[in-house]
Amino acid sequence: MNKVGILLILFILSLILPFTALYLAGDTHLITVKDIINFLLKGTTGNEFKDIIIKDVRLPPIIGAVLIGLTISVAGLMLQTLFRNLLASPYTTGISSGVLMVVALVIFIDSLSHLFEIFGEKSILVAGWCGGIFSMILLIIIALRVREANGVIIVALLLSYFFMGLRAYLIANAEELKIQEYWGFTIGSLSKITLGDVIPMTICSIIFIIGVMFLIKSLNALLFGEQYAKSFGLDIKKTRLLVLFFASFITGAIIPYVGLIAFIGIIAPYLARPLIKTSDHRYLVPATMFLGVILMVSCHILSLKYYLPIHYLYGINRPASPLPIGAVLDILGGMLVVYLVYKGEKKIKID
C-alpha cells in the first residue's frame, strides 16, 4: 500500500476512535450509541442528565487525548530530527523537567504556595505554564551558546538530572499531603481536564500545528545533516531555535493540564517511520499525528476499562483503582518497542 493510502487509513481510525471512546468511557447501558450521535449532531441527547455526563465527564478527556496525540507526538518527531536521536523527546530534552521543577517549587515551598494562591484552583496550572516558559528560555539560551545539536541535548539532559535531584530533595523534606499532590500531577491523567480547559489547549495546538507546517521543508533538509543543510542555504541556528521554541511552547502549554505524559513523543514517531516507509516530513508529520491520536485515545479507553488490582499486589483491603493514562502508555508502548527491536523487524533510522 502506498503512503497516501496508509495515511488515509490512519486518518479514518483517528476519527473513529474518539467517537468510540465517547461511548465506551463509562456505563454503556446508561448512554447509548444513539445518545452519542444525537449529542454530536444536535448538541443534546434530549436528557439533561446524559448531556451533563457527556459534556462535563466524557468529552473533555477525549478532546485532551486527541490534542496531546496531535501535538506532543510531533514535538517528539521534530526534536528527533533536530538532534538525529530516536530518544529525543520533550522529556529527554529537559522541557518537561522544567515544568515539573516549577510545579514542585510551588507545591513544596510555602512562600511560593502562598504567592500562587491568588490563582485558586488553577495555581498548579499557572505554575506549569511558568515552568514551560522557563524551559523555553533555558533551551533557547543553551541553543544560542552551544554550536552542535548533540551538545544541546547533552546539556539539556544534564540539566534535567539536576532538576530531578532538586525535586528529590524537596520531596524528601515535604509533608505527605504535598507529596501526594505532586505525585498526582506527575503520573499523567486526563481526568482533571474540563470543557473550559479545552479552549486554550485547542488554540495552543492550532498555533503549534501551523508552526510545524512552516518547518517541514527545514526538517527535511536537516535529515542530511547540518553541513549539507547549510550548503542549501538553511539557517541552522534559526531552524534550531524555532524547533526548540515550538516544542517547548506546546509542551509547556499542554503538560500543566494533564501532568507528565512523555512517552507519546517517542513511540508515535518510532512507529510512524516504518509504517509509511519514508522520512519525508510531508508524510511523516501527519502519520505521527494520526498515530499519536490513535495511541492516546486507545490508552484512554484501556485506562478506564481496566483496573489495577491493588489488593492482590500489596495485600491490602482497597478497591481496584483506575490506571492513569500515563502508566498505560508507558507500559504498553514500552513493551511494543522492546518487542519490535527484539524481533528485529523494525530497523529505524532518522534519515
UniProtKB/Swiss-Prot annotation:
Annotated CDD domains: TM_ABC_iron-siderophores_like (cd06550)
Location of this chain's protein in the cell: Cell membrane
Endpoints of the signal sequence: none
Keyword check for Transport: yes
Superkingdom of origin: Archaea
GO molecular-function term, one example from the UniProt record: transmembrane transporter activity
Mode of membrane association: Multi-pass membrane protein
Keywords: Cell membrane, Membrane, Transmembrane, Transmembrane helix, Transport
Primary residence: membrane
GO cellular component assignments: plasma membrane
GO terms, biological process: siderophore-dependent iron import into cell
Spans through the membrane: 4-24, 59-79, 99-119, 124-144, 152-172, 196-216, 249-269, 284-304, 322-342
Protein role: Probably part of a binding-protein-dependent transport system. Probably responsible for the translocation of the substrate across the membrane.
Annotated family: Belongs to the binding-protein-dependent transport system permease family. FecCD subfamily.
UniProt name for this protein: Putative ABC transporter permease protein MJ0876
